[in-house]
Amino acid sequence: MAITGGMQSSDMVLLLWITVICACCSFVDSSRSHRQLITSPSTTGVCRYGIKAECCYGWKRNRKGQCEAVCEQGCKHGECVGPNKCKCFPGFTGKNCNQDLNECGLKPRPCEHRCMNTHGSYKCYCLNGYMLMPDGSCSNSRTCAMANCQYGCEQVKGDIRCLCPSGGLQLGPDGRTCIDIDECAVGKASCPINRRCVNTFGSYYCKCQIGYELKYVNGRYDCIDINECLLNTHKCSINADCLNTQGSFKCRCKHGFKGNGQECSAVFNKPVKESPKFGGSVKDAIKKLLAHKNSLNRYNDIKNVIPETFITPPPKNRLQPFDYEDGVYIGGNDNDEEEGEIEEEEEEELDEEDEENVIEEEKLLRGDVFARQVKRAAVLSSQPISNTDPVLKSDEVLVDCRFDQGTCEWKQDSKDDFDWKHAERHNGNGYYMSVPASTSQKKGIGRLKLQLTKIYYKYCLMFIYRLAGERVGKLRVYIDENINPIWEETKNRDEGWRTAKIEIQESSTRKSSSITFEAVRGKDEAGIMALDNVFLSSGPCSDD
């Protein structure tokens, strides 16, 4: 009985151990089933998390609800078959299937005689004297040996024809050698709109357009614009802003500068919207010149007209000076009109005989050349026309130059450092002379010189000028070859146009023969010096 009882105890212990081991095994199985991969063909990439089925790590659910592998770098010439795992198409290799496979370098060689690698494939051709068979092998052919083809030949219905190993090659004029076909030029290439065709021998490939680079974006390779402005690879001026565009960039000069963007030069801080107007004596002198021009125009109109003997009554109201046959009148005075009528009746017969000669001696004035003679006294009182050259009793306008037709009688000095430039106003209304900001050297000198043909004891020189810039330089006026200027101006607070009036007094021992404008360039590269409306007359300047 004791033995029997001991045996029963050992059996119980053994049974207990078996139960514990089974429980542990079932626990391990249950823990493994918490994340179990489902290997069904229809559920590739699906893992079970407990009772829930989701895509495994490295897989994602597509629009159809199926789990598909994710390749972060993409598969250019292949397909993604697993997490970051590509299966390349024939003819390509590499982790991302973006490299051409050189089949001709494989062992064993795919061709019996000669192999030519192409993009994504290869071509076989035979040596001279052999024929390419349908299975890719080369067969000896006496006819092909006689054909002397560059890349072998084939026999079609008893006719021998030389072959080219690629569709991008064609038989040359001799019928034996192969020449390249430029698919890009003949339009056989097929490239996306944002890529350009690059021809190769026997083929071609598509490359991103200039200004684009190939990048992997949103699961595929595409040509993306290069931001030249961000990479600082543009060619814009330091005084211009770079604006990136698709495939290119644009340069736009900053505020205060002008140019094409690659070269920008400074402009005026205060653009001139209209031509400056003279005031005072300058305005009066110009009115006198215009009155004389009107007189000459009237003389020219009646030059070939036979004068009649009847008397034309003058108008009662004259608002500005006009030239008539016996002189210049200014309206507003009835007594002067009556006196003019009496003088006209008395002197009409004498003037008719000499009128033609007087008219021929008069010349039309131009605003950009020397004025011959302007009667200042004629504007103030009426005088009859004489048979001789008119003798001015007062001032003469020697120069009235606005630089609209060039530099008039002013000449560039050949011994200075730079020339004055002929510049157009911003509003397109006229021209002026300027010293450009980009001169070849600092403190350079540029001169404009005028030779005087008539000598007077006094001159009145009037002009407008502009000096813009912190250290733009100096503008001077010289008489003859004197070393000391009679007038000098530097930059002032008002950088707009200003009027200058200089009275030149001659001595009994010296007479002026030339007047010179001299510009001395300063250190400011963005400043400018300008000159316009130069007016020179004999006599003193008025105090108006």
Curated annotation (Swiss-Prot):
One of its GO terms (biological process) is cell adhesion. Disulfide bonds join C67-C80, C71-C86, C88-C97, C104-C115, C111-C124, C126-C138, C184-C197, C191-C206, C229-C242, C236-C251, C253-C264. Its main location: secreted. SMART domains: EGF (SM00181), EGF_CA (SM00179), MAM (SM00137). It comes from Xenopus laevis. The keyword Protein biosynthesis does not apply. Residues 1-30 form the signal peptide. Residues 399-543 form the MAM domain. Residues 63-98, 100-139, 144-178, 180-218, 225-265 form the EGF-like domain. One of its GO terms (cellular component) is basement membrane. Residues 333-367 form a coiled coil. This is Epidermal growth factor-like protein 6. Transmembrane segments: none annotated. Residues 334-357 have a biased composition (Acidic residues). Pfam families: EGF_CA, MAM. May play a role in organ morphogenesis. Promotes matrix assembly. Residues 332-357 are annotated as: Disordered. PANTHER family: EPIDERMAL GROWTH FACTOR-LIKE PROTEIN 6 (PTHR24050:SF24), PA14 DOMAIN-CONTAINING PROTEIN (PTHR24050). It comes from the Eukaryota. It is found in: Secreted, Extracellular space, Extracellular matrix, Basement membrane. Belongs to the nephronectin family. GO terms for molecular function: calcium ion binding. The keyword Coiled coil applies. Keywords: Basement membrane, Calcium, Cell adhesion, Coiled coil, Developmental protein, Differentiation, Disulfide bond, EGF-like domain, Extracellular matrix, Repeat, Secreted, Signal.
